[in-house]
Amino acid sequence: MASGILGSIKEEVTCPICLELLTEPLSLDCGHSFCQACITANHKESMLHQGERSCPLCRLPYQSENLRPNRHLASIVERLREVMLRPEERQNVDHCARHGEKLLLFCEQDGNIICWLCERSQEHRGHNTFLVEEVAQKYREKLQVALETMRQKQQDAEKLEADVRQEQASWKIQIQNDKTNIMAEFKQLRDILDCEESNELQNLEKEEKNILKRLVQSENDMVLQTQSVRVLISDLERRLQGSVVELLQDVDGVIKRIEKVTLQKPKTFLNEKRRVFRAPDLKRMLQVLKELTEVQRYWAHVTLVPSHPSYTIISEDGRQVRYQKPIRHLLVKVQYFYGVLGSPSITSGKHYWEVDVSNKRAWTLGVCVSLKCTANQSVSGTENYQPKNGYWVIGLRNAGNYRAFQSSFEFRDFLAGSRLTLSPPLIVPLFMTICPNRVGVFLDYEARTISFFNVTSNGFLIYKFSDCHFSYPVFPYFNPMTCELPMTLCSPSS
């Protein structure tokens, strides 16, 4: 009877998950108790498959913070273990619960130990039985193999658990990176839209000022016209109400003046002639921005190098150049349009740099070969600015005239057989929707191309030279022209 009660108590304090006595028991809100390690492992599995924590027995949900240690059950388990380790209880374990005889035999069919009375019972009649000492080593070896197998499975299970955790961490990193990229892409979109909105509003304000200015002038003209008509009407009324002498005095002149009166209609502005707003092409803008981002990967550290005497001043850090007016009494004549070069020289690879030309009314920049190789002392102005003379440049003149300089091809050039000729360059007008404050220059030496980007306008291509023939090392080229505001080399972080 005591063993039956002991069995009932043992059943009450057995973990439903591992089927062993409770270890550090924790109780759920529903009242069921489990080993701390068992319910923790079950919590991970439950979250993985169901997305919430639930009791393994009744499936009622619970919160992990509501798990509470059950000290009462822990005390019962501790005392139960003490009782089970007592000699008299261990003796009861070694004896048959049904017959009270010592358990000395092993039934192969049932896989259990029995006493000699059990062997003779109808239940075990015809079964193969052996002394426990005879089969102990055999099953010890089997259990040892099973133990090694389970240990290996435990390692595999732990590895699988670690793999899942690693995959989970990897996914978290990947998702976070995707979030960062998405936020960056949409920020670029918002920046582009903000820039386009600002430009459209500025253009609209300019249009408004222009139209209203002309309408105000037209209104003033109409006021003067109305006043002139009123003066003539007053003169006619005075003559009609006066004497005959007043009526007929210079009457022919008055009639001729009236006949010449022609009302001028005010100037109007038709809506059809207005600039029509069109939503920006975001796909094209993103493609342009992507191209700019791609070439910016080849950002080169360029510094300005003083050349032959010129009308330019370079800053101490070699990042800025500006025009300086010549001193009148100097006898040395210097051709300012040669500008200055950037260092180092370029003989291969891809190179990119940006130049700040904010608020300048004139500038020229691009790429050229050594000034000593290109300088033609008999040429003045911009006639040297031609690819055949070793210049691949674009520029601004008079604050709004953007242009690129291409080689001119004249018959006399062919007859001369020389790279340096007196024929002026071919001027290619460049039309800007947004005037560039920053210009990006990208040189691909192997591809023989030089591209200019309007960084202010999200990287739209300004102009591109193709099939460039680089027979010498080439250099970045900068010419502030006669505008005293500086040209500044930009850093990648600016």
Swiss-Prot record:
Protein's cellular compartments: Cytoplasm; Nucleus
Q: Report which residue ranges the record marks as coiled coil.
A: 132-223
User: Which terms are listed as keywords in the entry?
Assistant: Acetylation, Antiviral defense, Autophagy, Coiled coil, Cytoplasm, Immunity, Innate immunity, Metal-binding, Nucleus, Transferase, Ubl conjugation, Ubl conjugation pathway, Zinc, Zinc-finger
Zinc finger residue ranges, B box-type: 91-132
For this chain, the Swiss-Prot or TrEMBL PTM comment says: Degraded in a proteasome-independent fashion in the absence of viral infection but in a proteasome-dependent fashion following exposure to restriction sensitive virus. Autoubiquitinated in a RING finger- and UBE2D2-dependent manner. Monoubiquitinated by TRIM21. Deubiquitinated by Yersinia YopJ. Ubiquitination may not lead to proteasomal degradation.
ZnF RING-type: positions: 15-59
The lineage is: Eukaryota, Metazoa, Chordata, Craniata, Vertebrata
What binding partners and quaternary form does the record give?
Can form homodimers and homotrimers. In addition to lower-order dimerization, also exhibits a higher-order multimerization and both low- and high-order multimerizations are essential for its restriction activity. Interacts with BTBD1 and BTBD2. Interacts with PSMC4, PSMC5, PSMD7 and HSPA8/HSC70. Interacts (via B30.2/SPRY domain) with HSPA1A/B. Interacts with PSMC2, MAP3K7/TAK1, TAB2 and TAB3. Interacts with SQSTM1. Interacts with TRIM6 and TRIM34. Interacts with ULK1 (phosphorylated form), GABARAP, GABARAPL1, GABARAPL2, MAP1LC3A, MAP1LC3C and BECN1.
Record-linked InterPro entries: B30.2/SPRY, B30.2/SPRY_sf, Butyrophylin_SPRY, ConA-like_dom_sf, SPRY_dom, TRIM/RBCC, Znf-RING_euk, Znf_B-box
Q: What is this protein called?
A: Tripartite motif-containing protein 5
N-acetylalanine modification, residue list: A2
Reaction(s) catalysed (UniProt annotation): S-ubiquitinyl-[E2 ubiquitin-conjugating enzyme]-L-cysteine + [acceptor protein]-L-lysine = [E2 ubiquitin-conjugating enzyme]-L-cysteine + N(6)-ubiquitinyl-[acceptor protein]-L-lysine
Task: Please name the GO terms that the record assigns under molecular function.
Answer: pattern recognition receptor activity; ubiquitin-protein transferase activity; zinc ion binding
